[in-house]
């Protein structure tokens, strides 16, 4: 599960993903329930996408308040068709791209938590798969944009399976280590605008050589 990442500058996102300059944003660390930028299909321009600022932590349609008492910043891909918080966004095609310069994960191989930072080896930003929702407060009329980051089981991944604290009660093949899901630039349109089947085919683990990863400097 990812709980910390760094978003790019607005200008970098606009150039890389070819979105218009509609949302001012400075590069920043993003944490759960904090605001962050994401890209989604533009509802006014078919086959285009827009940059939106929303809360990292999806607010589902049935929520009574945007201040949730449970975590929705990550969504297991294996559960998105059944879990109440996410199945509506998936079924309605509310898929998004979460731009990131890097993301951090905890490594416990030394017996204590050492944060590792993950960048792309080619220097490009990450485009991480996510889901979004627009929630409206029925009392005040406030509109809240929000998003969640998809994760996939990474028990067999040579790099991502080294992250997070092992559960001593479970065997090595039952740890359910997780990885974010990168969407390559050439697949963005299929992810944002394609059929559920086409989008699901893009949910896969990235090869280890895609990553430039190591401990965060103290």
Indicate residue ranges for each PLM-predicted region.
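A contiguous pocket-lining binding segment that forms or flanks enzyme active sites
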Residues: 115-164
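A glycine-rich, hydrophobic loop/mini-helix early in the fold
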Residues: 48-90
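Short Gly/aromatic-enriched secondary-structure transition segments
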Residues: 52-56, 111-120
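Conserved SET/PR-domain catalytic core that frames the SAM/AdoMet-binding pocket
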Residues: 84-110
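A residue-level signal for conserved active-site and pocket-lining positions in enzyme catalytic cores
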Residues: 2, 38, 98, 128, ...
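Residues immediately flanking
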Residues: 100-102, 152, 185-186
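C-terminal accessory segment of soluble enzyme catalytic cores
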Residues: 1, 13, 73, 155-218
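Extreme N-terminus nucleophile/cap motif
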Residues: 1-57, 196-201, 207-211
